Amino acid sequence: MSLLTQTINHIGPLDDQAATAARRRQDMLTKPAGSLGRLEELSIRIAGITGRERPRLTKPAVIVMAADHGVARQGVSAFPAEVTPQMVLNFLRGGAAINVLARHVGAQVIVVDIGVAADLPSHPELVSRKLAYGTADFSQEPAMSRDLAQQAIEVGITCANEAIDSGVDLLATGEMGIANTTAASAVVAAITGRPVAEVTGRGTGIDDASLARKIAVIERALVLHQPNPRDGLDVLAKVGGLEIGGLAGVILGAAARRVPVVIDGFISGAAALIAATLAPAAVNYMIAGHRSVERGHAAVFDRLDLKPLLDLDMRLGEGTGAVLAMSLCQAACKVLDEMATFAEAGVSEKKEA
């Protein structure tokens, strides 16, 4: 049995008993019931995910998957492909936005080379799991084989398992890869059935002509390959990316281990859609970190029926929105765990009518 199949088979429902106990405790805390709004619901959700009435999230980490895309040769990005390895080195030096924000919230940054189209120097903080030097140009041929797509997902599962085995109890998804919004738009259009123009944005800031070219490239690719929207592996293989597959694996791995996983932006959203086609129950373990201004992100949340915690007009990726949302997950759990109940504090409860 493959690692992917084993992992999917281990994804079960939320723990209703833990969630019910958490809700009961929320109602006993020294505040009007519901007065902390979505923080209360978030803590109850995390209780159901972890199976603990009073979950404590003390070791967060963001897994940043990096890979290149053959479709970049079609002029769909404002930046050249060599930016991918350059940014990976920036991550390793601690100089990127994800590093700054992760330090702010106390999260570990795990950088994974799953498909960068360059040989990166060895570094103690680099997880080298390169499967290929980027994908093929999916405007001409499938992005990768079905076998390679499964390998990408299994790399992500392994990375999630390794992080959880080291004590990580809250995961977030992040990525780097020039032209990966093109692949993400293709994945989202294929799975949701939305028109390509409706789920395709400017990515790194392309002009009108480049946006029109990007849309046309994706439309032609979907006609050429006819990805099956009910088969996440087929969609990933035909129009996806190695880092998208890796992140789908991170999500599945977290779900199988009952660890909450905070979904970042548009590319992570595409990975979440792939994970959901493979294991619908995995959606229960996803927390939507933020709403990206990248146009297709709303379609992702509509399909998954998730409501993002933050809406800050961000569109960087890397996991930046997700790590900010991690602090809300931790805050929600701290309120549930550390606040006194009415009985403990000697505070009178609300009078019954």
UniProtKB/Swiss-Prot annotation:
Signal sequence region: none
Catalytic activity: 5,6-dimethylbenzimidazole + nicotinate beta-D-ribonucleotide = alpha-ribazole 5'-phosphate + nicotinate + H(+)
Record lineage: Bacteria, Bacillati, Chloroflexota, Chloroflexia, Chloroflexales
Function noted in UniProt: Catalyzes the synthesis of alpha-ribazole-5'-phosphate from nicotinate mononucleotide (NAMN) and 5,6-dimethylbenzimidazole (DMB).
HAMAP family xref list: CobT (MF_00230)
Keyword Transferase: yes
Class of the enzyme per the UniProt entry, highest EC level: transferase
Record keyword Transferase present: yes
Organism of origin: Chloroflexus aggregans (strain MD-66 / DSM 9485)
UniProt name for this protein: Nicotinate-nucleotide--dimethylbenzimidazole phosphoribosyltransferase
One GO biological process term: cobalamin biosynthetic process
Source domain of life: Bacteria
Gene: cobT
